[in-house]
C-alpha cells in the first residue's frame, strides 16, 4: 500500500457552487438580489478573483457557454480538455465523420436489407448535450448511403430559450428538403426523453413514441406538434410526446431490423432511454415493443457496459492520465466526493475524466435529489442533508481532501423562476456559511468556485423571456485559507486543481498544464 504523503491544511476541499456566475449588474441577477451575508463576508475577508468557464478556455468553440460536464472534466483534469462537441464538429468539417466505423456499420446494416435508420437527439445549438449540426450530418450520411431516415427530435428549452424549438425545426426541415431525404417522426421534450434521475415514467413516454408510435398526442408535422404544445401551456423542455404519422397515416416507429443512432454527445441524460432500447433484462417500465435492431449506436460512450448489450460507440473517450482523483489516490490520500443525484455523475464520473470506477480511498456520498417535478417547487433541494453529511465528514478527520457540488444555483436556475432562484441563493449562502465555519474550526482550507454561470442572469434581452440556459459570464474563485496569499487574475477551470494541490503542499503532475492561481511572489 502506498504510504500517504503528509498534506498541509487537512482537509483541503473544493466546493463547487454549480451555476453561480459573476455579473456586475444586479437586474435579473438572483445572486445579487438575494440576502447572502456569508457570501458577502467571504468576499470581504478572503482573496478572490474571477475565472473563465466557457469557450476555448474549456475546450469548446469560441463563445460557447460552458456546462457541468465540461466544467467538471476540466476541473478534475487540471488541464484544458477538448470536448466532444469540438472533436466531432472537426471530424464533420474534415469529412472523417462520414467514414466513422460504427456509423457506417449501423447505417449499412439497415439500408442493405431495406430497413430504416432512426436518428434520436436533442435538437438545438445549445452545445451542452448535442448540436443540430451533428444531427444534420448524421441525416446526410445515412441518406447518402441509401438509407430511409426518420428523426425523433427532443426539444430543448433549457440550454436554449424556452420557446425556440420552431427555429430549429425550420432549419432541420429546410435542410432535409434540400437534401431530398429524412423525415421527423416524433417530437418529445427533453424533460421526458432525457431524464437522468430515474423518473422512468417520463422516459416511457418517449420510448413509446419512438418504439411503438404510441403517444397521447398526434400532429401532421413537427411545427404543428410544437404549436399544439404551446397552446397547452408547455414550453420546449416539457413538450409531451407527439407522433407524426406518415402519409399512409401510420407512425414511423422503430421496427425489427432497423438501426438507431443516438446523436447526443453528452452521456448522462442519454443513458436511461438507451437502456430501454438495448437491455434484454430491462425492467424499469413495461416496454410496449422490444424491436430487434440491426444496430444501436451511441455517439459517445454513454456507459462502459453498454457494449455488452450490443451498443456500438462512434466516438470513444480520450484517456486522461493523472486526474486529481487518480493522482491523490496514488499519494495514499483519502478523498470524499459528495453531491446530490442531479450532480453526482459530475463529481465522480466526469471529475475523474470519464472513469466510472472510484479510485482507491475515494469515498462517495450520494444525497437523493427531491422528487419534485421542477426544482422551483423546492429551491433548497436536498442541500440541508448534503450540508450535514459534509460537516460530519469534515469533523470526522478521515479525509485529506473533498470535492463537493452544490446543485441549487444551476438546477433552480434552469427553471427561470426568479423568486425561486433568490430562495436557492439564500439556501446556498446559509449552508456555505456552516460548511466554511466547520472547515475553519478543524484548521482546514478550501476553494469556493463554480463550473459555469446561470443564476446571475435570468432574463433573455433578445426574446424578453426568462433565460433558462447557462451563461458565458466568469465565475468567482475564492481562496478560503489561513495564509492570505493574493490570487492571480486571468485563470480558468484548468487552474483550480493545480491551486488546490498547491494549498495541500503537493506538486502537480506533469500532465496538468493548468497553473496555481496563488501568487506567492
UniProtKB/Swiss-Prot annotation:
This enzyme's EC code(s): 5.4.2.12
Pathway involvement of the protein, from the record: Carbohydrate degradation; glycolysis; pyruvate from D-glyceraldehyde 3-phosphate: step 3/5
Manner of cofactor binding, per the entry note: Binds 2 manganese ions per subunit.
GO biological process, one term: glycolytic process
Binding positions (Mn(2+) 1): 410, 414, 470
Residues where substrate binds: 129, 158-159, 190, 196, 266-269, 343
Catalysed reaction equations from the record: (2R)-2-phosphoglycerate = (2R)-3-phosphoglycerate
Needed cofactors: Mn(2+)
Gene3D superfamilies according to UniProt: Alkaline Phosphatase, subunit A, BPG-independent phosphoglycerate mutase, domain B
Pfam families in alphabetical order: iPGM_N, Metalloenzyme
A GO term, aspect molecular function: manganese ion binding
Keyword terms of this UniProt record: Glycolysis, Isomerase, Manganese, Metal-binding
Residues where Mn(2+) 2 binds: 18, 68, 451-452
Active-site residues from the entry: 68
GO cellular component, one term: cytosol
Superkingdom to which the source organism belongs: Bacteria
NCBIfam families: pgm_bpd_ind
Record text on subunit structure and interactions: Monomer.
Function: Catalyzes the interconversion of 2-phosphoglycerate and 3-phosphoglycerate.
Similarity annotation: Belongs to the BPG-independent phosphoglycerate mutase family.
Annotated protein name in UniProt: 2,3-bisphosphoglycerate-independent phosphoglycerate mutase
Top-level taxonomy: Bacteria, Pseudomonadati, Pseudomonadota, Gammaproteobacteria, Thiotrichales
